Amino acid sequence: MSQAVQTNGTQPLSKTWELSLYELQRTPQEAITDGLEIVVSPRSLHSELMCPICLDMLKNTMTTKECLHRFCADCIITALRSGNKECPTCRKKLVSKRSLRPDPNFDALISKIYPSRDEYEAHQERVLARINKHNNQQALSHSIEEGLKIQAMNRLQRGKKQQIENGSGAEDNGDSSHCSNASTHSNQEAGPSNKRTKTSDDSGLEPDNNNAAMAIDPVMDGASEIELVFRPHPTLMEKDDSAQTRYIKTSGNATVDHLSKYLAVRLALEELRSKGESNQMNLDTASEKQYTIYIATASGQFTVLNGSFSLELVSEKYWKVNKPMELYYAPTKEHK
């Protein structure tokens, strides 16, 4: 393929280039005109929506003008201030913030894919706050424990040193009475020292116990347990043996989908036991999509819960009272 280019001169110059095999074979994609919808999992888009610096979802997206790579505004500005005047992805030269431009369209796309992002970020901040609180408490407890152990060892060494010095002084004088008094004095000095050492050792064991308790508490604290009263929906659930109130205690990090899957497996297992069957096919086909979880609002209406919501988030958003949370279940219409 050739192209004639007119220059300022009297005769045109011809420019020739060769097409690659891809360029020769490629065809335009056909436009979708029949209303077909293509479902794409948000997880498959994570690499496209992730900031290469913080490895989290892009926030206040900034795009480089030269190479068009995207970063969080805070991340790329911090990187430029630290002295690395280059793109973290391709190492292309970036002079300053003037080499960046905001990308509100990409932020709008992310908010369209993840409409509940604010709730997700609030949950992440709460989890990080719990982890930081536990780490600070554990570091303080460990520091106190080590300090008590060092103090106990120093007291013990001082007591032994005083015994040796008093004993050697008595031998040099050769006075038996003085030796007796010195040994008595040494024992008296060593006695309180040993007592103090023992007390310190005893007190040193207390942080161990507290530390052991703290080693368990953060796990419980990071995933605080939530008590549930799981009732059948008063209008959508048929009155049969499976329609009974269930009482559950589980982790606050469990999602509504986990609850639906548990309910499906539980009811399938109860059905097998009632029929006396041993076929496990019903358990394998149990899905979280079989049941829909509801919560009653203040207006007396039932709100369908998003399957990705954690129970802790549901409690903070809808329940807000210090008593077991009441949820309702009913078969999903597509699975009836």
Curated annotation (Swiss-Prot):
Keyword Acetylation listed: yes
Any one Gene Ontology molecular-function term assigned to this protein's record: chromatin binding
GO BP: any one term: negative regulation of transcription by RNA polymerase II
Region feature Interaction with nucleosomes via an acidic patch on histone H2A and histone H2B, mapped onto this chain: 93-98
GO cellular component terms attached to this protein's record: chromosome; cytoplasm; MLL1 complex; nucleus; PcG protein complex; PRC1 complex; ubiquitin ligase complex
Region called Interaction with HIP2, residue ranges: 2-179
Domain of life: Eukaryota
Keyword Ribosomal protein listed: no
Covalent cross-link Glycyl lysine isopeptide (Lys-Gly) (interchain with G-Cter in ubiquitin) as placed by the record, residue numbers: 112
Region (Disordered): 157-213
InterPro entries assigned: RAWUL, RING1/RING2, RING2_RAWUL_dom, Znf_RING, Znf_RING/FYVE/PHD, Znf_RING_CS
Span of zinc fingers (RING-type): 51-91
Post-translational modification summary for this protein: Monoubiquitinated, by auto-ubiquitination. Polyubiquitinated in the presence of UBE2D3 (in vitro).
Pathway assigned in UniProt: Protein modification; protein ubiquitination
Residues bearing the modification N-acetylserine: 2
Composition skew (Polar residues), residue ranges: 176-191
PANTHER family, sorted: E3 UBIQUITIN-PROTEIN LIGASE RING1 / RING 2 FAMILY MEMBER, E3 UBIQUITIN-PROTEIN LIGASE RING2
Function summary: E3 ubiquitin-protein ligase that mediates monoubiquitination of 'Lys-119' of histone H2A (H2AK119Ub), thereby playing a central role in histone code and gene regulation. H2AK119Ub gives a specific tag for epigenetic transcriptional repression and participates in X chromosome inactivation of female mammals. May be involved in the initiation of both imprinted and random X inactivation.
Record's subunit section: Component of chromatin-associated Polycomb (PcG) complexes. Component of a number of PRC1-like complexes; these complexes contain either the polycomb group ring finger protein PCGF1, or PCGF2, or PCGF3, or BMI1, or PCGF5, or PCGF6. Distinct PRC1-like complexes are composed of a RING1 subunit (RING1B or RING1A), one of the six PCGF proteins (PCGF1, PCGF2, PCGF3, BMI1, PCGF5 or PCGF6), one PHC protein (PHC1, PHC2 or PHC3) and one of the CBX proteins (CBX2, CBX4, CBX6, CBX7 or CBX8).
Protein name: E3 ubiquitin-protein ligase RING2
Organism expressing this protein natively: Pongo abelii (Sumatran orangutan)
